[in-house]
């Protein structure tokens, strides 16, 4: 239901309880106990049900669901920040992979450049770094879905944070042909009017084999359905929600 094991959820709930005075003696009584409220928040990130449906399921109002999301998601982010930073630091000791996903967000009034011609829907371009085992280790700041991966790679902060990997003598950062020209390892580009050599073909096959791991990592990240089936909340909140989901996925995979 939450995307986490029972042990992982228990630890997270205990850490959140330290930071949140949930049952304060003053103020309005809570509709749900803290552990149940935390289940609700994780459930919505994992399954992306409408908030009114979640309210029906858990026996509280839609307004209460919204309030718990706004209150608990930042706390989850804080609790998991140290672990996420440690995992990212460890990942810098080996080769890495990068790819982009476009998280659907729908059309938004007054917001331009969300439409991805490649994906054929409106979304946010999210740059994802994975280790060679196919687990997410870093995610960049989101940008409009119309932005090419090569540009989003630079704009999102990923290029700078992983620059040492694709400098001479670096451990290597590999991407698909959408990253050609950025300096990272990419498939060989076929020149017009020239046949691709057997060596180039084998090189491209080896790059594809390596890149399969980042595709697995993105599939795991998109199991948090809020990044797959349509983000409906305020677009201004998307970067924060993305950071929280990224840390939850890192915790799920490494915790």
Label each PLM-derived region with a short phrase.
Residues 52:
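Residues within the helices of the helix-turn-helix
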Residues 24-30, 231-235:
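Short, surface-exposed loop/turn segments at secondary-structure junctions
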Residues 55-67, 73-74, 78-255:
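Short, well-ordered secondary-structure "scaffold" segments embedded in the functional core
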Residues 1-27, 81:
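Charged, often Cys/His-bearing segments associated with DNA-binding zinc-finger transcription factors
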Residues 33-48:
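Short, amphipathic alpha-helical "recognition" segments used to contact nucleic acids or chromatin
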Residues 21-23, 36, 200:
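Glycine/charged-rich beta-loop-alpha catalytic/anionic-binding loops adjacent to active sites
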């Amino acid at each position: 239901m939450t995307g986490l094991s029972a042990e992982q959820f228990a630890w997270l709930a205990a850490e959140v309880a330290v930071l949140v005075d949930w049952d304060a003696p003053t103020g309005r009584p809570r509709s749900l106990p803290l552990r149940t409220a935390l289940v609700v928040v994780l459930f919505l990130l994992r399954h992306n049900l409408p908030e009114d449906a979640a309210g029906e399921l858990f026996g509280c109002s839609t307004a209460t669901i919204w309030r718990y999301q706004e209150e608990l998601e930042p706390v989850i982010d804080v609790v998991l920040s140290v672990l996420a930073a440690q995992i990212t630091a460890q990942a810098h000791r080996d080769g890495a992979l990068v790819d982009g996903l476009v998280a659907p967000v729908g059309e938004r009034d007054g917001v331009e450049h969300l439409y991805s011609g490649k994906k054929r829907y409106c979304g946010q371009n999210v740059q994802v770094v994975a280790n060679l085992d196919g687990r997410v280790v870093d995610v960049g700041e989101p940008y409009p879905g119309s932005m090419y991966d090569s540009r989003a790679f630079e704009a999102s902060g990923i290029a700078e944070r992983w620059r040492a990997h694709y400098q001479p003598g670096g451990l290597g950062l590999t991407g698909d042909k959408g990253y050609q020209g950025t300096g990272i390892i990419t498939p060989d580009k076929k020149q017009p009017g020239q046949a691709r050599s057997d060596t180039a073909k084998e090189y491209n096959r080896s790059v594809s084999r390596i890149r399969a791991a980042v595709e697995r990592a993105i599939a795991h990240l998109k199991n948090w359905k809020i990044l797959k089936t349509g983000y409906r909340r305020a677009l201004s909140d998307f970067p924060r929600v993305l950071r929280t989901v990224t840390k939850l996925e890192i915790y799920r995979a490494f915790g």
